[in-house]
């Protein structure tokens, strides 16, 4: 409890000090830009959801479905492969389709994929698992690329370094939240 109190005091001091710096280490002033703030929050949420799935799935696949460690690893592979394929495609499309539309399509696919993962049962086939994971990965790739582009482009050009730092912080914060939620 004492540690949390110290964290609150030091955190408050740090944030107030950063707000008065010309080149802050933590550029909180960028959160005053509505589209930047929304994109950062959706990035945090998407990485939280991703880690919830990616950390909990190995336990489910091994303990509930009885797959070996090797098979579990192979079953999880379609997600990053689908992301690997769709993220560059989204980079190409973001120049032709509004990032909000493309990101919304990606987020919708990601949510459908996550929901479909929640319907897995002991009778689910390997093909069914792979298709669900591919849907998650494809949606994630279609969402992240336009969202990242929006984050960087919504900040003033001279602040692109700070925006990039906030992008990395959002990713790590989301991954940390997701992993922590699995542990609870």
Residue ranges and their predicted role:
Residues 1-2, 15-20:
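Phenylalanine-glycine-rich, low-complexity intrinsically disordered regions
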Residues 3-6, 10, 22-184:
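12-transmembrane solute porter fold
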């Amino acid at each position: 409890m004492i540690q949390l109190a110290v964290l609150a005091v030091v955190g408050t001091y740090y944030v107030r000090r950063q707000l008065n710096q010309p080149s802050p280490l933590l550029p909180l002033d960028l959160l005053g830009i509505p589209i930047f703030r929304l994109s950062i929050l959706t990035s945090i949420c998407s990485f939280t959801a991703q880690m919830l799935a990616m950390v909990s799935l190995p336990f489910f696949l091994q303990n509930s479905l009885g797959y070996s460690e090797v098979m579990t690893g192979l079953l999880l592979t379609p997600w990053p492969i689908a992301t690997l394929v769709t993220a560059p495609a989204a980079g190409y499309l973001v120049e032709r389709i509004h990032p909000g539309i493309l990101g919304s399509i990606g987020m919708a696919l990601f949510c459908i994929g996550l929901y479909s993962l929640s319907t897995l049962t002991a009778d689910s086939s390997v093909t069914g698992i792979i298709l669900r994971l591919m849907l998650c990965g494809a949606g994630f790739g279609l969402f992240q690329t336009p969202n990242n582009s929006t984050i960087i482009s919504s900040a003033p050009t001279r602040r692109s370094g700070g925006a990039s730092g906030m992008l990395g912080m959002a990713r790590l914060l989301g991954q940390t939240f997701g992993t922590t939620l699995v542990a609870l």
